[in-house]
């Protein structure tokens, strides 16, 4: 058995987003809504999308092959591969099995893991499963890859501008620069019909928008409470020498130097960060930090607090400076690409890595909040214990975002229609152009009369 691993975490990370996007300000005009509804009200700038040439198999194949290539990873060195997605093409065959095409040529078929599904939470569950594997007697000494990706698409209406598409692949192993703090996380899971996909004939979800925001907010509260409780337990077990809140910090929230959130919209992220500060206020209303907070807010019922505009406005104001320093660097991809469902929170981490220099990042703690409707959620954290320079260089984020083709809303609408027509089709050839697809990207060429899908890779 391999020696027990230390400092397990993220050793490398790759992000893929389609080469085309639509401008949200143009979409506002096209949809006939007031200026700023999407750009200010939702906090969204652009939205990634794909036509019928790309699907979840092609997205994950592109992302994992790119991770292997950019970091010169030997496919034989991977002992586990797990995928988190809610974009299902098959009710039986996993996306992970499709990815085995990248490992079979070298003879590596001894790779554990399949898919894990629960709305936008699947990637986090895949990560937790992988950490558990690496800490267990089942670990054989090899690294693992966790994949999180989705195509987020809504029918015409209010929710359509909150779509997006993208995929993240992470190399997980010991002695990582981004170390997941062991044993330190809090989760909240409950039964809720806030967003679900019970209509298997449609690619579109059934959504109760306001209820889903309420569920997300409750999950923020409960995960923070559970994380704090777990931290206290670990601290007491370590005789007060671990995971404590520094006396110099104004509030418990300050123990996170940065935070990443699952980002259905960037506006919800800013509200949720402020909500954590509200939780700190309830725990210690006499703290000097909260001296301007109206006294009556501490006596609100829990239900009322979730939708109370005074609570929201007061704590967004109080959190504004902290948000700019600690969360703003993480929302570059969410605002420029939209919601990637399972990949969303890890795209936030990609943004953070790309926007904070490796030198400034050292020793910092990052809080990560993951949410999936239905619902499952967790708050966990990582510590930066090594250089992130190579990751930043390989991501080349800003240049890649800038290189995308921005299309008119009319074109985006056509692409959505193409996807709608392609859904559940067999004996089918995609209609989308391959000219817009970038080199080294997988794309769909054919679906035969037994629904078997065939792909090609765009050549350099």
Curated annotation (Swiss-Prot):
Transmembrane segments: none
InterPro entries noted in UniProt: HMG_CoA_synt_AS (IPR000590), HMG_CoA_synt_C_dom (IPR013746), HMG_CoA_synth_N (IPR013528), HMG_CoA_synthase_euk (IPR010122), Thiolase-like (IPR016039)
SUPFAM superfamilies cross-referenced by the UniProt entry: Thiolase-like
Any single Pfam family the record assigns to this protein: HMG_CoA_synt_C
Binding site for (3S)-3-hydroxy-3-methylglutaryl-CoA: 35, 120, 158, 162, 212, 262, 271, 339, 373
Catalytic activity: acetoacetyl-CoA + acetyl-CoA + H2O = (3S)-3-hydroxy-3-methylglutaryl-CoA + CoA + H(+)
Keywords assigned by UniProt, alphabetized: Transferase, Virulence
GO BP annotation list: acetyl-CoA metabolic process; ergosterol biosynthetic process; farnesyl diphosphate biosynthetic process, mevalonate pathway
Protein task: Hydroxymethylglutaryl-CoA synthase involved in the biosynthesis of a ferrichrome A-like siderophors which may contribute to organismal virulence. The first step of siderophore biosynthesis is performed by the HMG-CoA synthase (HMGS) MYCGRDRAFT_54740 which catalyzes the generation of HMG-CoA and CoA using acetoacetyl-CoA and acetyl-CoA as substrates. The enoyl-CoA isomerase/hydratase MYCGRDRAFT_76805 then catalyzes the conversion of HMG-CoA to methylglutaconyl-CoA.
PANTHER family: 3-HYDROXY-3-METHYLGLUTARYL COENZYME A SYNTHASE, HYDROXYMETHYLGLUTARYL-COA SYNTHASE
Protein name: Hydroxymethylglutaryl-CoA synthase MYCGRDRAFT_54740
Source organism of the structure: Zymoseptoria tritici (strain CBS 115943 / IPO323) (Speckled leaf blotch fungus)
Gene name as annotated: ERG13
């Amino acid at each position: 058995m391999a020696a027990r691993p230390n400092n397990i975490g993220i050793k490398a990370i790759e992000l893929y987003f389609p080469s085309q996007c639509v401008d949200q300000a143009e979409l506002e005009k096209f949809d006939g809504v007031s200026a700023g509804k999407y750009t200010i009200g939702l906090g969204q700038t652009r939205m990634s999308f794909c036509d019928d040439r790309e699907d979840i198999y092609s997205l994950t194949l592109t992302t994992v092959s790119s991770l292997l290539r950019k970091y010169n990873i030997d496919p034989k060195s991977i002992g586990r591969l797990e995928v988190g997605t809610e974009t299902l093409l098959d009710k039986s065959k996993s996306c992970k099995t499709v990815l085995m095409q990248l490992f079979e040529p070298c003879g590596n078929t001894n790779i554990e893991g399949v898919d894990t599904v629960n709305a936008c939470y699947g990637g986090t569950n895949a990560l937790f499963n992988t950490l558990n594997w690496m800490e267990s007697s089942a670990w054989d000494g090899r690294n693992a890859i966790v994949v999180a990706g989705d195509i987020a698409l809504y029918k015409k209406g209010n929710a359509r501008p909150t779509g997006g598409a993208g995929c993240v692949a992470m190399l997980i192993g010991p002695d990582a620069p981004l170390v997941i703090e062991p044993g330190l996380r809090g989760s909240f899971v409950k039964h809720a019909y806030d967003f679900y996909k019970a209509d298997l004939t449609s690619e579109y979800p059934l959504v109760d928008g306001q209820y889903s925001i309420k569920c997300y907010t409750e999950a923020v509260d409960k995960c923070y409470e559970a994380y704090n409780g777990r931290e206290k337990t670990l601290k007491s077990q370590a005789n007060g020498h671990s995971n404590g809140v520094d006396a110099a910090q104004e509030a418990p929230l300050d123990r996170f130097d940065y935070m990443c959130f699952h980002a259905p919209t960037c506006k919800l992220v800013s509200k949720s960060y402020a909500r954590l500060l509200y939780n700190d206020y309830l725990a210690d209303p006499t703290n000097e930090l909260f001296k301007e907070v109206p006294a009556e807010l501490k006596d609100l019922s829990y239900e009322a607090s979730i939708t109370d505009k005074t609570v929201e406005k007061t704590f967004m104001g109080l959190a504004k400076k902290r948000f700019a320093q600690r969360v703003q660097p993480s929302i570059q991809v969410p605002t420029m690409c939209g919601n990637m469902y399972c990949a969303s929170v890890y795209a936030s981490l990609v943004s953070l890595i790309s926007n904070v220099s490796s030198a400034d990042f050292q020793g910092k703690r990052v809080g990560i909040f993951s949410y999936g409707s239905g619902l499952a959620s967790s708050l966990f954290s990582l510590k930066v214990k090594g250089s992130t320079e190579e990751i930043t260089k390989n991501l080349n984020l800003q240049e890649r975002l800038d290189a995308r083709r921005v299309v008119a809303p009319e074109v985006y609408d056509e692409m959505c229609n193409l996807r709608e027509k392609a859904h559940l089709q067999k004996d089918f050839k995609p209609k989308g152009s391959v000219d817009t697809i970038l080199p080294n990207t997988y794309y769909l060429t054919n679906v035969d009369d037994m629904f078997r899908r065939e792909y090609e890779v765009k050549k350099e």
